[in-house]
Amino acid sequence: RLFQEIREKRGLAYSVYAYAQQFAGTGVLGFYAGCNPTKSVEVVEIIQEVLSDVVQNGLTVEEIDRAKGAVRGSLVLSQEDTGSRMSRIGKSEIVYGEIMSFDDILKSIARVTPDEVRAVASEFLIKSPTLAVVGPHKDLRKFEKVLRNGGSK
């Protein structure tokens, strides 16, 4: 949804993506947009608006199915690389205290429901965001205002 809104619909960024990293007891859910510095505040506003919409309205079944397919595809491709397989197995042991089989991971992905996505979104997407800005920005007050207002202008 972020890619569609920021890159495809508005043409404001060169690259837009989301990523997640899980660790024992904590993690990171991040969003990245590489854009012209003159558009960066607008891009942050749009990210906040999209995240707020996900919290309020959830994702469609189609969006969730697309995301599941992307995660499954990425996981399957990662199995071709020995280093990726070792990393997945080690991370599983450290984070979950057990090694989850490839099939169990695929089954877990398949079980994700719209209600679960919305619950996680409500818990994590708009509370206490942290923003890293790289570029020629001397005055960060506009960014701080966007974060305080949750994307609403």
Where on the chain are the PLM-derived regions?
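A short, acidic, amphipathic alpha-helical segment used as a generic capping/interface helix at domain edges
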Residues: 112-120
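Proteolytic maturation boundary segments
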Residues: 126-153
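M16 family metallopeptidases and their MPP-like homologs
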Residues: 3-56, 61-111, 127-135
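Short, solvent-exposed polar/charged micro-motifs at secondary-structure junctions
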Residues: 26-28, 113, 141-145
